[in-house]
Every structure is written in structure tokens, then in C-alpha cells.
Amino acid sequence: MARLKPLPQLWLISDARNDAALGHALAQMPRGGGFIFRHYHLPPAQRRARFDQLARLAGARGHLVALAGSRAEARRWGAELAYGPRGDLVPAHSLREIGRARNAIALLISPAFATRSHPGAKPLGPLRFRLLAARATVPVIALGGMNARTAQRLGWPSWAGIDAFLR
């Protein structure tokens, strides 16, 4: 998909555990952030209805909206970007995955820190995160245990969180 504006530095990612607070979280984020709608837990019709509702809220705050799915699906649903292995925003956990993300406009490298999304997964930590990020040829968004405090510890300006904006 064509990029019309710069990528946001702050991103909110939807998840089953933060669904009830997403409206509040979208309102609390600084204007012009990014919102990645996943909601894999919902049946297709409910997922679409929830996307439409949250995309309206996100758009009212000037947030860029990405849909977890194919680029074609993202276009059909009215999202500005697609999130996923073959999307515009590509999650990456290793050098191999970074290399496979040839058509990405940005990478979400994770897990930067310990995260509730993947309990038991070994976090990269600041050094390994930066080593992976240095190999990327597109902008990198830190993911995994991210909030304002961990972003400062990582020393990385662009980050995404699931729980970070729920307070």
C-alpha cells in the first residue's frame, strides 16, 4: 500500500485481553499514533464490526490504522496498512525473519523485553534488540514488554504496546 504520511512512533496493538479498554486507550494515546487491529479471537463478522468501530475512533484521533491480514483484506476493510508476515508492518523475532521481510515498510522486532503475550519467551534485551535492528533496511518498531519506561531503557523512539496505554 502507498504511504501517504510518516509512520507514527507510538503504536497500540489490539488483543483479546485489552479489548474492553481500547476506546479509552485510543483516546489517551497522543494524536497521530498507530493502531494495529488483530482480534484473532473473534469470529469473522464480529471481528469486522469491532474493526469498524475501533477504526472510527482511531481515525477521529488521527491514528494510522493497520489490519492484521493481507494487503487486499486491509484495503477492503479501509485500513491504511496490513500487519503480518507478508504485510506492510512485519513482525520479526530473528535475523532470518528480518531477511524475509523484503516488502515491509517497517518491522516490529520482538520481544524486546519480557511480555505477557509470550510468557517464557527469552527477551532480546537492549543489546540484542539493537543488533537485530541494525540489520533492518526499514524503520523498526520495538515490541514486547514496551511502555514509556522500557522504551526509555531501550533508547528506541518507536515502539508498540498492548497494555502500555491502558492506564
Predicted regions and their residues:
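Non-catalytic positions within long, well-ordered alpha-helices that form the structural scaffold/packing
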Residues: 28, 75, 99-103, 152-155
